[in-house]
Amino acid sequence: MEDSNSHPQNQTSKRKSSHPQKKQRMENETRSAKLLDLDVLDCPVCFEPLTIPTFQCDDGHIVCNFCFAKVSNKCPGPGCDLPIGNKRCFAMERVLESAFVPCQNTEFGCTKSVSYEKVSSHEKECNYSQCSCPNLECNYTGSYNIIYGHFMRRHLYNSTIVSSKWGYSTVDVLINIKEKVSVLWESRQKLLFVVQCFKERHGVYVTVRRIAPPASEFKKFSYRLSYSIDGHNVTYESPEVKRLLEVNSQIPDDSFMFVPNCLLHGFLIKPANEVQQVTIAQETVMEDPPTSLFKNSVPIREDQIQNAITNSIR
């Protein structure tokens, strides 16, 4: 007698009947796998993490969305001359959506895991991103609140010294425009602001930045720059002080005051005449009426430095 279980037709029916169960199991379970080499998820052109949408040529060479606009419809793959049009690589996009990796700031306290395609955007906004010391000759890095304590201990004598009081909402300081980097600090909230002057062929660019991660939950500040000489005035106002993780020498693309050469006394700027005023205001309303948070910067004696350090890092 022929075993009914061995009949090919019955076997086919049995396999088909198991498919709904398998589908149900996959819907009810979260399956995971370990990817040993994350480099396979990087764009072969810019070597940055692939982002959605991802495009491919007919041979399967892929390119990220940003590089796609730069390759002029030509596949960047080695030895490949096929056109790369609007053909999406949905298989890779699905991998990017499902591949979660921990933030690189895990060791500093971040507990978030994000999809691989969003790693770059998350780490730019992560509260635990590491900041660099605003002193250009120092390589120290740490969280933004640690950087404040480091700066006050190591570099206070190099900064623009300004006084501060709790409950006030604005800061007014005078800074010589010939200084490339001036650091303003406020002890109660442990804030570091950097005023930079970039001398270029046609004049000087002046910016104000705050040492802090660019996360939205940090308090916002507005600012006003003004420059006066021989009756001529240049002013610039911005509703928000941009945040940065590291001071650099790159000429700003936006949010700056420009002082043309016609208002400068040549390359060597006269300290007595060419002074700019910086006003920084906090967006949050304080309980006390807004007055000057910082007084105009004044020379500080050596015996005052240690007291200032002690009070500021308590």
Swiss-Prot record:
Known catalytic reactions: S-ubiquitinyl-[E2 ubiquitin-conjugating enzyme]-L-cysteine + [acceptor protein]-L-lysine = [E2 ubiquitin-conjugating enzyme]-L-cysteine + N(6)-ubiquitinyl-[acceptor protein]-L-lysine
Region (Disordered): 1-31
Pathway: Protein modification; protein ubiquitination
Zinc-finger ranges (SIAH-type): 98-156
Regions of compositional bias (Polar residues) in chain numbering: 1-12
UniProt EC number: 2.3.2.27
Biased composition (Basic residues): 13-23
Binding site for Zn(2+) 1: C103, C110, H122, C126
GO molecular function, one term: zinc ion binding
Enzyme class: transferase
Start and end residues of each stretch annotated as SBD: 95-280
InterPro entries in alphabetical order: Sina-like_RING (IPR049548), SINL_plant (IPR044286), Znf_RING/FYVE/PHD (IPR013083), Znf_SIAH (IPR013010)
Protein family membership: Belongs to the SINA (Seven in absentia) family.
Function per UniProt: E3 ubiquitin-protein ligase that mediates ubiquitination and subsequent proteasomal degradation of target proteins. E3 ubiquitin ligases accept ubiquitin from an E2 ubiquitin-conjugating enzyme in the form of a thioester and then directly transfers the ubiquitin to targeted substrates. It probably triggers the ubiquitin-mediated degradation of different substrates.
Protein name: E3 ubiquitin-protein ligase SINA-like 11
Organism for this UniProt entry: Arabidopsis thaliana (Mouse-ear cress)
